[in-house]
Amino acid sequence: MDLFPAIDLRNGKCVRLHQGDYGQETVYGDDPVAQALAFADAGAGWIHVVDLDAARTGVPENRDVVAAIAAAVPVPVQTGGGVRNRAAALALFDAGVERVVVGTAALADPDFVRDLAADHRVAVGLDAKAGEVATDGWLVGSGRSVLDVARSFADAGVDAFVVTDISRDGTLEGPDLVGLREVVEATPVDVIASGGVGTIADLRALAEIGVGGRRLAGVITGKAIYEGRFTVAEGVAALEIES
């Protein structure tokens, strides 16, 4: 089970939002590349990068920063935010990104995801409010449930589902263990949890989720690390102990 330290980009800086609210932003640094290197040096096996500006507008305003991170770190980079078409995805792969997360476009154009997943590593972002998948930077409800969308992509060849509980994101109040277990149970696709992690105990609880011998593939965490709740090394160790 992998730990994915998160770097959320807005105006080229490392930030975190509270419950996906662009009006509740905390800036944690103005050198995302240095932050990514620090995460990798501390033992992270992946770096998770989100372009928050692109997630809202579809314009890849931080693509150069994403490319600089991918070029600098010795571990694979997973990135999402505003990947609305094949050209945008290919630009990220060309920049050295290992896996692209597609959210809004996955619901609007499922065939785009299926075609891209045929020859690239793709994850589908399932960002939910009260069980409903949200799109366009978490601002628009889709009318579809997480389980419905997950099942619709079960045979699409995607690498993973990144499941985020928007109401918990940036709160440090703990992840939605029940909802995550339901997604693991519903499809054979790897599931990466995101949102709400605040303690080492939360990581251990996530590592204990198991259905039919399957477990979560990973967990994304940002604020807990930035706020000093635990270090990357401690997080990695917690997941290794329980896996």
Regions flagged by a language model, labelled:
Residues 11-15, 19-23, 90-93, 97-169:
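Conserved anion-binding
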Residues 32, 60-67, 139-148, 173-182:
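Charged helix-capping and loop-helix junction motifs
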Residues 28-40, 85-90, 142-152:
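Short, acidic/polar
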Residues 72-100, 111, 178-215, 230-235:
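Catalytic cores of alpha/beta
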Residues 2-6, 46, 74-78, 98-101, ...:
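Structural preference for beta-strand elements that scaffold enzyme active sites
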Residues 8, 39, 47, 92, ...:
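Conserved, mostly hydrophobic/aromatic
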Residues 46-64, 104, 163-172:
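Glycine-rich, proline-tolerant flexible connector loops at the mouths of alpha/beta enzymes
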Residues 54-59, 108, 132, 141, ...:
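Short, small-residue-enriched loops and turns at beta-alpha junctions
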